[in-house]
């Protein structure tokens, strides 16, 4: 289970005065809640207003509308606002744990360790209804490797259990465990170093994945090389803590990709030199600050001058849920487009103030400057204070529908000891290597 500390909670108010249903909820996607409630209760989306609240932990477990429709119906019947908050046992019973499964992986390799063919059959437990993340499991199984011949089969298995749900790259750990175990078996049988074996077969730019997509520039090779260069890889294993313990070292690689979706961002320039940034992205993991940083970079102003806020479903254009490592990407892109829009309007406004052609004005590093007269300079704060008397407010907008997937790779080395008498395991040392791409906010990574 996702194990978030904060349980689901929602309040609904179905007003007879304006026939409007208002929902306050802690969900990873308030537009998703609006659409699901609309479908379940058979009412138009225009009559539903969802106000996002802080959600705490989510990890994929707060995507689906669980209690919001129930609160809405009770509010309609009672004529009063209704709040439902789950206790811990209810969270575990009804919100959807991750899928268990069975994965069978087989790899064919030459005596030199080159992978030439592989198969993978994945069986994931969907629970009471179809819909396990079988596509994820199949698509990521051999994603770190360049194998010319692949056959993958996925089985979405319905069982007499609670419905399963998303949990941090759902399906991926299941298939990765099986594949990496098979790679280790080949390494031992051929007496080839496990990292060198993976590097020999590493996916790179131009490699075709199992789903037919072709990798652009990726970091699998760089990740493997970083392992080879690290002292953890070259140093000897520590001694066991006592005679009943045996020590060992494990090495494994993995892959995950972000999803995509629609996003909307609106920016309003305020007279005191700040910007109100309105987004439809629920903040999970620091989304607001990462969006503000990407916006601020375009204008060359300090991110602390950006005041991001998450709007309700009536106040911003459709924005898909904050899931699948997508929020900073799609909403950051929308913020970038919004900042470009504002930048263009600032240059237009300054050209009118200075009475010069717009193409002679450029806004960068937090100020407007003239390309033809070095004496003409105006700071963002000064320009902001003149908006009312020079043409009115400046508002920018960014709308995107992000497509594509940027694959990310990882490697992990763990030293551990196990008590051969009791089975107790102690982790002695763990080093993770992350193909993080561009860290927008490094301290959050």
What does each model-found stretch correspond to?
Residues 1-222, 229, 239-445:
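Cofactor-binding beta-sheet edge motifs in enzyme active sites
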């Amino acid at each position: 289970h996702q194990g978030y500390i904060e349980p689901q909670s929602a309040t609904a108010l179905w007003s007879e005065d304006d026939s409007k249903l208002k929902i306050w909820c802690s969900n990873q996607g308030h537009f998703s809640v609006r659409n699901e409630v609309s479908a379940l209760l058979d009412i138009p989306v225009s009559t539903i207003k969802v106000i996002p609240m802080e959600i705490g932990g989510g990890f994929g477990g707060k995507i689906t509308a669980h209690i919001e429709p129930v609160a809405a119906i009770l509010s309609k019947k009672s004529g009063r606002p209704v709040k439902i908050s789950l206790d811990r046992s209810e969270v575990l019973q009804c919100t959807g744990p991750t899928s268990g499964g069975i994965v069978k992986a087989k790899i064919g390799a030459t005596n030199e360790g080159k992978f030439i063919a592989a198969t993978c059959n994945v069986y994931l437990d969907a629970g009471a209804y179809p819909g396990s993340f079988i596509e994820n499991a199949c698509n990521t199984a051999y994603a770190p490797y360049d194998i010319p011949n692949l056959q993958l089969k996925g089985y979405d298995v319905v069982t007499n259990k609670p419905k399963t749900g998303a949990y941090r790259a759902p399906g991926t750990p299941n298939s990765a465990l099986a594949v990496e175990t098979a790679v280790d078996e080949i390494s031992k049988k051929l007496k080839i170093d496990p990292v060198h074996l993976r590097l020999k077969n590493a996916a790179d730019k131009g490699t075709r994945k199992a789903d037919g997509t072709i990798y652009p520039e990726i970091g699998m090779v760089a990740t493997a090389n970083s392992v080879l260069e690290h002292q953890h890889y070259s140093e000897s294993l520590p001694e066991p803590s006592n005679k009943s313990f045996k020590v060992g070292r494990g090495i494994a690689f993995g892959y995950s990709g972000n999803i995509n979706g629609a996003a909307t961002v609106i920016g309003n320039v305020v007279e005191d030199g700040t910007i109100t940034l309105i987004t439809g992205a629920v903040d999970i993991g620091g989304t607001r600050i990462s969006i503000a940083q990407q916006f601020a970079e375009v204008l060359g102003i300090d991110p602390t001058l950006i005041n991001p806020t998450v709007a309700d479903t009536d106040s911003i254009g459709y924005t898909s849920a904050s899931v699948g490592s997508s929020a900073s990407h799609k909403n950051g892109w929308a913020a970038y487009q919004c900042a470009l829009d504002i930048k263009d309007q600032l240059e237009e406004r300054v050209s009118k103030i200075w009475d010069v052609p717009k193409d002679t004005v450029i806004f960068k590093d937090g100020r407007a400057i003239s390309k033809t007269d070095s004496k003409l300079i105006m700071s963002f704060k000064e320009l902001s204070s003149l908006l009312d008397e020079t043409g009115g407010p400046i508002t920018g907008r960014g709308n995107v529908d992000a497509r594509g997937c940027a694959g990310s790779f990882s490697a992990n080395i763990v030293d551990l000891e196990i008590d051969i008498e009791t089975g107790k395991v102690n982790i002695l040392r763990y080093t993770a290597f992350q193909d993080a791409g561009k860290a927008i906010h490094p301290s959050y990574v």
